[in-house]
Regions:
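Pre-Walker A (Motif I) flank of P-loop NTPase domains
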Residues: 1-4, 69-70
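Hydrophobic anchor at the beta1->P-loop junction of P-loop NTPases
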Residues: 7
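P-loop (Walker A) phosphate-binding loop of NTP-binding proteins
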Residues: 10
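ATP-binding Walker
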Residues: 13
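Conserved substrate/cofactor phosphate-moiety recognition/catalytic segment
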Residues: 16-62
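Glycine-rich phosphate-binding loop used to anchor ATP phosphates in small-molecule kinases
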Residues: 52-96
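Conserved phosphate-donor/acceptor-positioning beta-strand/loop module used by diverse small-molecule
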Residues: 95-115
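Small-molecule kinase domains that catalyze NTP-dependent phosphoryl transfer to phosphate-bearing small molecules
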Residues: 117-160, 167-188
Length: 188
């Protein structure tokens, strides 16, 4: 049975890193980071761009769900509200698909420190810290399985996600890297 693994959480909690690790470990998997579907410069939030990102996400996820080469589809994005998750899931063809939804969370101080390091390395803007901390409490009300990642490595998070999704142990062995949405297909 195909599985869709949705991973939500505030910026900086480790969604992308953990999902990349999970993607690397699961055979026949596809990985989509919702941020790739809204990569605008300057970043613009309005009704049109909100509709665009949902269209982009749902189009790509449905293509992965229809593709026989994909057994596990991993999707991560901030998703701070149940309405956003519901809007995405309502537009997907989930017949015959096992759905597994998670939120990665951590204590505010842990999240602040992770983001501070990213800011110091030039990976994020300073304002992300307050925005991410403001989102943190919203994940308590999502109808998802929560995973506190404050003391976990990305590999440990990936292994726990796989376990909670019921992936057989043999499925969780490290696999060679493969192309994901947003990656170059030059040598594919």
């Amino acid at each position: 049975m195909k599985r869709l693994i949705v991973v939500a959480g505030p910026m900086g909690v480790g969604k992308t890193t953990a999902c990349r690790e999970l993607h690397r470990r699961l055979p026949r998997s596809a990985f989509l980071d919702g941020d790739w579907c809204w990569d605008l410069h300057p970043f613009t939030v309005n009704a049109q761009t909100k509709a665009m990102v949902l269209d982009n996400i749902c189009h790509l996820l449905n293509n992965f769900l229809r593709c026989d080469a994909c057994e596990s589809i991993i999707f991560c994005w901030v998703i701070p509200e149940q309405a956003i998750l519901d809007a995405i899931l309502a537009r997907l063809d989930l017949r015959g698909v096992g759905l597994h939804c998670f939120a990665l969370v951590a204590e505010a101080e842990v999240l602040r420190e992770r983001l501070r390091r990213d800011v110091e390395c030039g990976l994020r803007d300073e304002d992300v810290i307050l925005r991410s901390l403001a989102y943190l409490g919203k994940y308590a009300s999502l109808d998802v399985d929560r995973l506190d990642v404050r003391a976990m490595s990305p590999a440990e998070v990936a292994a726990e996600l796989a376990r909670r999704c019921g992936c057989p142990v043999s499925d969780v062995e490290a696999q060679p890297n493969r192309i994901s949405a947003g990656a170059s297909t030059e040598n594919a």
